[in-house]
Amino acid sequence: MAPKKKVAGLIKLQIVAGQANPAPPVGPALGQHGVNIMEFCKAYNAATENQRGNVIPVEITVYEDRSFTFTLKTPPAAKLLLKAAGVAKGSAEPHKTKVAKVTWDQVREIAETKKTDLNANDVDAAAKIIAGTARSMGITVE
């Protein structure tokens, strides 16, 4: 077995799927760790090709020899809720002004998608987490 590579850094970014380019925020974040920026952009765009339009968080592990690996996460719950509710942004005063409504079925569907990234044991617990996010955005869950 080959010796383990030493980790030099961990970078977390949220990039629109299929649209990673060397411009900020991607370029500076990777450049300071000495990563080949174009190599990452091509790999990320290829990996997220089928999810175009969604914001996909990525966790990039940079090693001392300047090589890297990355893990794709599920889209942020807030973005999925906005898409389900059909609104551009959440409420400025979430507990006073409600901007939209989503059904429990939509919340459960989002919870199914997010379950791997959430700290929940089952779909019901994940749905409660998503409902809490909706509430804090001014979206009513029915």
UniProtKB/Swiss-Prot annotation:
One GO cellular component, as annotated: peptidoglycan-based cell wall
Q: Which chain positions lie within coiled-coil regions? A: none
UniProt keyword Ribonucleoprotein, yes or no: yes
Pfam family membership, one: Ribosomal_L11_N
UniProt KW keywords? Isopeptide bond, Methylation, Ribonucleoprotein, Ribosomal protein, RNA-binding, rRNA-binding, Ubl conjugation
Molecular-function GO terms, alphabetical: large ribosomal subunit rRNA binding; structural constituent of ribosome
InterPro entries (UniProt xref): Ribosomal_uL11 (IPR000911), Ribosomal_uL11_bac-typ (IPR006519), Ribosomal_uL11_C (IPR020783), Ribosomal_uL11_C_sf (IPR036769), Ribosomal_uL11_CS (IPR020785), Ribosomal_uL11_N (IPR020784), Ribosomal_uL11_N_sf (IPR036796)
Q: How is it modified after translation?
A: One or more lysine residues are methylated.
Name any Gene Ontology BP term.
translation
Q: Does the keyword rRNA-binding apply?
A: yes
List, alphabetically, the HAMAP family matched: Ribosomal_uL11 (MF_00736)
PANTHER family reported in the protein's UniProt record:
60S RIBOSOMAL PROTEIN L12, LARGE RIBOSOMAL SUBUNIT PROTEIN UL11M
Question: Which NCBIfam families does the record cross-reference, listed alphabetically?
Answer: L11_bact
Question: Hey, which family's this protein in?
Answer: Belongs to the universal ribosomal protein uL11 family.
Q: What does this protein do?
A: Forms part of the ribosomal stalk which helps the ribosome interact with GTP-bound translation factors.
Assembly, in brief, is: Part of the ribosomal stalk of the 50S ribosomal subunit. Interacts with L10 and the large rRNA to form the base of the stalk. L10 forms an elongated spine to which L12 dimers bind in a sequential fashion forming a multimeric L10(L12)X complex.
The name of this protein is Large ribosomal subunit protein uL11
